[in-house]
Amino acid sequence: MGSTVKNSLLWVFESIEDDPGFMRKRLFGFEAAYVDGLLCLSVGNGEEPWNGLLVCTSRDRHADLIREFPELAPHPVLGKWLYLSQTHEEFEALAGAVVEVVRRRDSRVGVEPAARKKSAKKNRFV
């Protein structure tokens, strides 16, 4: 059974929810934002370091994004993605600015989602 606890950071996606390319999915306890099929952002309100905004990108794009948003840092567990803790005093404004970058289809943000692994079918009737 799924969790009934609502993610308090869903408001971060409000400005792009009407975009025809937008889709939201649950992802490992986070809510993820996809735009045009690319995984772009994820929000979660758990314990640090799972308490804020994840910017889905590749390591080769980190420096450029951090130049624009110095408050972003590589996530301590998922180092390929950038992270902004919701405890940051400017979280709301920064999250809004990052979402605007996604809305503009900035090529620095967004990764192809990993293909699902097919589970081996078990023959239960042998």
Put a short name on every predicted segment.
Residues 123-126:
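Catalytic cores of nucleic-acid ligases and guanylyltransferases
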Residues 2-39:
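N-terminal first-folded block
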Residues 58-119:
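Short, structured beta-strand-loop surface elements
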Residues 26-29, 34-77:
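Short, conserved beta-strand/beta-arch hydrophobic-aromatic motifs that form part
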